[in-house]
Amino acid sequence: MKRNISKVAVLGSGIMGSGIACHFANIGVEVLLLDICPSELNESEKQKNLSLDSKAVKNRIVNEMFNKCIKSKPSPIYSKNFIKRIKLGNFDDDISKIKSADWIIEVVVEKLEIKQKVFDLIEKHRTPGTIVTSNTSGIPIKLMSKGRSDDFNKNFAITHFFNPPRYLNLFEVIPSPNCDKHLLSFLLKYGEKYLGKTSILAKDTPAFIGNRIGTFGIQSLFHQVKNGDYTIEEIDKLTGSIIGRPKSATFRTADVVGLDTLISVSKGIYDSCKNDESIEIFKEPDFLKKMVKNNALGSKTGKGFYKKIKDNLSLIHI
């Protein structure tokens, strides 16, 4: 089956969803970016006498998330002119529009039950044969594919982008148990030729390849701080550009990834790999759990290990 990708639907407009939408727009693809509708009005909407049925309210989440992404640095998009390639909408009003998409990418929160609800919507509205992929950073595809139709699973895989999607080179592809071999080949080649990535075929193992290694490295250093061996400043000075790695080093990288995402991936590994010789490394330290509880999730909430004040980053002492 010859495939041509002229329109992509991205379901979920968070930091990854909006970033992926921008990167497809960068290469000339039309994008439909959707997210959920709010469950209640904010103060501004109340003052304007809007209702939950108002279009502005229904699109509030996707608008806010996308605008935040566009303003982020480094820019997720090559040119502001490319923004017009991205259409915004919500699941209630616009989900039927995925029928015309050549590729549907799920990028919602890392909870299996929520992803399954999104897959139900996709099954209802997609055109048979359409590619469906998940950007999960660690949920096994064998679990996500349960209960899905034969056509869905034949065209289903994980395509794991790394944050930020425009800049990070790795692109992991994990096929569903019944994935069509031609689709798998297509995704790997598309990642290389059009998305500008290094495509890697990974097995359906906990956290795949990149996050299994990366999470181990980050968590190892978290425990160094917990044990009082090093400070955050010392670790970031020693694990950044001085050794040829990005200047975000360890703790700033964790902020970019999202501390809640980091905990989710770590927990998935901890629960699934009991025989791993270093399993205790994946058990998050108490200070990390406390930060997430206080909504200090990193870049997505404006504070994590670092807090942005105007154009400068200041370290928050934990």
What are these regions (language model features)?
Residues 1-316:
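N-terminal glycine-rich phosphate-binding loop for ADP-containing cofactors
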